[in-house]
Swiss-Prot record:
The active site is at 68, 133 (proton acceptor). This is Succinyl-diaminopimelate desuccinylase. HAMAP family: DapE. Binds 2 Zn(2+) or Co(2+) ions per subunit. It is an enzyme of class 3 (hydrolase). Homodimer. Its EC number is 3.5.1.18. Belongs to the peptidase M20A family. DapE subfamily. It holds the Pfam family Peptidase_M20. The keyword Hydrolase applies. The keyword Transcription regulation does not apply.
Amino acid sequence: MTCSITELAKKLISIPSVSPKDLGCQDIIIKRLCAIGFDIKRVNVNDTKNFWAFRGTGKTLTFAGHTDVVPIGQDKDWQTDPFQPVIRSGYLFGRGSADMKGALAAMITAAERFVNKFPNHKGRLSFLITSDEESSAVDGTIKVVEYLMSKRDMIDYCIVGEPSSTNIVGDVIKNGRRGSITANITIHGIQGHIAYPDLADNPIHKGLPVILKILSIKLDSGNDFFLPSSINIANIHAGNGFNNVIPGSLFVQFNIRFSSEVSEKHIQSQIVNILNSNDINYSIEWLFSGKPFITKKGLLIDTVIQSIFYFNKKKPILSTSGGTSDGRFIALMGSEVVELGLVNNTIHKVNECVKISDLKLLSCMYEDIMKNLLS
């Protein structure tokens, strides 16, 4: 089994599918799914490749993932070619090994074993795969979700294969994620010579008190599932590097990660009220990434915990920490959503790698979840 998983992972890693490119990864996966009786619906949008695969009827268990990867960074910093996967000391190295081509290989091989053992399984087993998760995420999973909702074709349970684990596979699972919204604020002034400040209007001087007020906003205190919402500066810029020029504008980008205690509209009003209450000329652009979502204890979480405990003899920690994931789109369908994947300590880094034994363990967990929900 390990060889089968590893070989599939290596095939996928060897394809330089930097987001949103797929470059043939999905063709490999689709071929294997077709061989075990899955129907395929491609939902391609612009440069993004998406597909929905399903087998059976009834309550639907979906495995969701992505074939795209982030850029490699500096090639010279890698010990090996990031798109020529190699095995060293029990680890598989390559871009996407942990995030998340290794998990894709674990899913597919788990499905192959499950279907072989239970060809007439109850319910429906499905896959939702995209090549637009790591970049804009506008043409990816959300488009498949919209397609399914237009057909009134709903997902009941979903396992997202994002690398949720911290030290060992299954020690942490994500049963929700915070929402995310970005505010791009430009404070406009009047450029001038720094020796004649009375002839200019310094946007930095006017902007700093406003920035501090925004950072001091307390949106909420969190709840049983989420930490308190946070406001952080992601980027700030003014001036052109000359020490004798007052800049004409100041740009500051805030990112807000928010809990289920507040809405994006409340966040927007809080920030806009501060801007309007100060004597500044500003413009603002909002980028909304997704609402918070939470899956409370139910059949899916109970099943995932049961499978993890079977292999690890220890229950996982339920967490909503970290960034956004495509689970936020699937949750719009009212689905129970849990993220269970590989260890995340090398994701997006140079020399990304995953233990071969972890690939096997994750695939076994996935198969056990299929068996417990569908057999």
